[in-house]
Amino acid sequence: MLAKRIIPCLDVRDGQVVKGVQFRNHEIIGDIVPLAQRYAEEGADELVFYDITASSDGRTIDKSWVERVAQVIDIPFCVAGGIKSVEDAEKLFAFGADKISINSPALADPDLINRLADRFGVQAIVVGIDSWFEKETGKYWVNQYTGDESRTRQTHWQLLDWVKEVQQRGAGEIVLNMMNQDGVRQGYDIAQLKLVRNLCHIPLIASGGAGEMVHFRDAFIEANVDGALAASVFHKRIIDIGELKDYLRKEKIKIR
């Protein structure tokens, strides 16, 4: 069994790390490079950076901080935001990113997944999915342009259909951002993760809802995810990564 991954997530806007609740009302957390350094030193397995308004603003990621991050950390990192072409991705890899993640651009142009996977290999291509549970219908929908709440919209894709589609097109990993749980620290949506896990034959990363160490344990044991991504609990030092890994080892979970 592969070791499970602990992945801090850094949402970036205007050159700063920010954090919202259910993708709204973002507060500034701090500067990108020192936070990245801190997490690498604390034992994170990987980092994910989302330039959250790049897609909704119609631009690509500011590459200057990507290069600075690559210079100061020695763990893999993934960047996302407004990547619409092989050329966009090429520049980010040249600046030191290990993986790229696409979300809204893939919904606008699903063939982008194929082109990126063909060019860079599936292992370098992550697809982020922003899911929203609609209580009235009991359905999980895929949302787009979630970095800007005024432009966020529900697509015609239901979650499980999109999960199948992105795998067929060459995604090497899926990060499932469960918007209903985001930032509220009540735990990952285990039922949703199980539904996706049953269909997902590539690494699956849970995102949205971590508030206590047991939430990570539940995602790993009950939903068998490959990694757990979290933001506010790490940013605000509610959970220490080293202590979290010790706890998970005691729970017999294989951790790096």
Swiss-Prot record:
GO molecular function: imidazoleglycerol-phosphate synthase activity; lyase activity
Enzyme Commission identifier(s): 4.3.2.10
Gene Ontology CC, one term: cytoplasm
CDD domains associated with the record: HisF (cd04731)
Pathway this chain belongs to: Amino-acid biosynthesis; L-histidine biosynthesis; L-histidine from 5-phospho-alpha-D-ribose 1-diphosphate: step 5/9
Pfam families: His_biosynth
Keyword field contains Cytoplasm: yes
Major localisation: cytoplasm
Keywords, comma-separated and alphabetical: Amino-acid biosynthesis, Cytoplasm, Histidine biosynthesis, Lyase
UniProt key word Phosphoprotein: no
Tree of life domain: Bacteria
SUPFAM superfamilies the record matches: Ribulose-phoshate binding barrel
Function per UniProt: IGPS catalyzes the conversion of PRFAR and glutamine to IGP, AICAR and glutamate. The HisF subunit catalyzes the cyclization activity that produces IGP and AICAR from PRFAR using the ammonia provided by the HisH subunit.
PANTHER family: IMIDAZOLE GLYCEROL PHOSPHATE SYNTHASE HISHF, IMIDAZOLE GLYCEROL PHOSPHATE SYNTHASE SUBUNIT HISF/H IGP SYNTHASE SUBUNIT HISF/H
NCBIfam families: hisF
Name of the protein: Imidazole glycerol phosphate synthase subunit HisF
Lineage: Bacteria, Pseudomonadati, Pseudomonadota, Gammaproteobacteria, Pasteurellales
Name of encoding gene: hisF
